[in-house]
């Protein structure tokens, strides 16, 4: 399962709409970098955040998730409380080819500050804004900057085409827009 280079990512983004909007070269000056890299794409976090709060002493249950556990914020700088997390989304909308699986890793700039980004793999033929889970593992509040780089996506091309894609299964997160909470 080879990792795909910048030339392939650029071609797929510009001719097939795999990443929209697509930033051709890495933007770095005065911001946390984003855009095309050698073997990946550094995505930006949008200015929409759902910040976890436990004012009602709730129990987190993925089968019966209570949306009131979050406070919605539209802001250029999100403050994530100590030992808490926030949900966000990418600025970019992704359309994954049928023979590709995409994995996501957090950027080292944030990891070195105790912020961890978690995203499940983007499956073949999935499309949408990527919902990002950002964990603040520190005992202090932490900042996340909207419209700057947060994570890097790596594109792995399969040796063949999968028999059943995410679209074929009519996956529950297909074509998601905005920050999407857990669904059953």
Swiss-Prot record:
Enzyme category, top tier: hydrolase
EC number(s) recorded for this UniProt protein: 3.5.4.13
GO biological process: dUMP biosynthetic process; dUTP biosynthetic process
UniProt GO molecular function: dCTP deaminase activity; nucleotide binding
Binding site for dCTP: 107-112, 131-133, 152, 166, 176
Keywords assigned by UniProt, alphabetized: Hydrolase, Nucleotide metabolism, Nucleotide-binding
Catalytic residue list: 133
Pathway linked to the protein: Pyrimidine metabolism; dUMP biosynthesis; dUMP from dCTP (dUTP route): step 1/2
Pfam families listed in its UniProt record: DCD
Reactions accelerated catalytically: dCTP + H2O + H(+) = dUTP + NH4(+)
Superkingdom of origin: Bacteria
Summary of the function given for this chain in its UniProt record: Catalyzes the deamination of dCTP to dUTP.
Record family assignment: Belongs to the dCTP deaminase family.
Quaternary structure note: Homotrimer.
Name of the protein in its database record: dCTP deaminase
Species per Swiss-Prot/TrEMBL record: Rhodospirillum centenum (strain ATCC 51521 / SW)
Lineage: Bacteria, Pseudomonadati, Pseudomonadota, Alphaproteobacteria, Rhodospirillales
Gene this protein is translated from: dcd
């Amino acid at each position: 399962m080879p990792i795909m280079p910048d030339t392939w990512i650029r071609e797929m983004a510009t001719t097939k709409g795999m990443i929209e909007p697509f930033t051709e070269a890495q933007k770095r000056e005065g911001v946390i970098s984003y855009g095309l890299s050698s073997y990946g794409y550094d995505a930006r976090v949008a200015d929409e955040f759902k910040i976890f709060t436990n004012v009602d002493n709730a129990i987190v249950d993925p089968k019966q998730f209570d949306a009131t556990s979050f406070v919605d914020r539209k802001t250029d700088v999100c403050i994530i409380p100590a030992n808490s997390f926030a949900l966000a989304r990418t600025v970019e909308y992704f359309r994954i080819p049928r023979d590709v699986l995409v994995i996501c890793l957090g950027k080292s700039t944030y990891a070195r500050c105790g912020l961890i980004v978690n995203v499940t793999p983007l499956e073949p033929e999935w499309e949408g804004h990527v919902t990002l889970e950002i964990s603040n593992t520190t005992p202090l509040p932490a900042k996340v900057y909207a419209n700057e780089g947060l994570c890097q996506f790596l594109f792995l091309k399969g040796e063949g085409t999968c028999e059943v894609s995410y679209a074929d299964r009519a996956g529950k997160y297909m074509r998601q827009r905005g920050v999407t909470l857990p669904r059953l």
